Amino acid sequence: MRRDPFNDVVQSALNSPRKAVVLLMVLGAFGAGYYVGVHGLPPALMPPGASVPGASQDNTSVDFSPKGGCTEAVIAELRAAKTSVHMQAYSFTSKGIIAALIEAHRRGVKVTLVNDKKAADEAGSKVSQAAEAGLDVRVDGAHAIAHNKIMLIDGRTIITGSFNFTNQAENSNAENLLVLHDKSELYQAYEANFQRHLGHSESYVVSQGKVERRGR
């Protein structure tokens, strides 16, 4: 019978506590290496700037930042939009998302943006660009902060989460983004909330090259 070298090592280790400890350390390292090779590094052990992969289940998907695909997920939904986009935002500086919104508008999609009033004028804000492109842009100043980060698309898709529509949220912040499809009762609740804030918001219009606000 052929001898098994690994079995010999195990038998030797069983006769020596010191060898047993070394063997356990080696096996532990091997097992950890195999797990990481197959499954990737566990999220708890990832460095702070690393991205965590998203997941999807039952018409629902989730993505995480930094650099975990949140902006890409938003843009993909906007490119698929056919009739309407209702958007609420606090800070809005993402070049990719404003481009996708303008592209949707040019396809004939009705795009309505309700942005926090103070944040609309922050450095890098895309609110004026949205207004200049012809989108229906409003500003909500009825609250300390209008902090909703939501998109409602075509009466069936909800995008929500902590993720601001900004470059910083994509590349630097720890955020989450949830995309839900065909959740009709949830959609109706989000749509009612959107309409409530739209009702007390001011229009944000462009006049003679300068963005001005005016009442509804």
Per-region residue spans from a language model:
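Signature of lipid phosphatidyltransferase scaffolds
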Residues: I158-R216
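Solvent-exposed loop/turn segments at secondary-structure junctions
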Residues: S91-K95, K117-D121, H143-A146, T157-I158, ...
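Primarily the HKD phosphodiesterase
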Residues: V74-D136
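Second-shell loop/turn segments in exported
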Residues: T60-S65, H86-A89, T112-K118, E175-L180
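Short, structured motif recognition centered on aromatic/hydrophobic residues
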Residues: Y90, I150, Y190, F194
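Short Gly/Pro-enriched turn/cap motifs at secondary-structure boundaries
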Residues: R138-A142
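Short, small/polar-rich loop/turn modules that mediate ligand/substrate recognition or access, typified
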Residues: R2-F64, G68, E72, V109, ...
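Extracellular/periplasmic catalytic domains that process cell-envelope and extracellular macromolecules
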Residues: R79, R106, A130-A131, H143-A146, ...
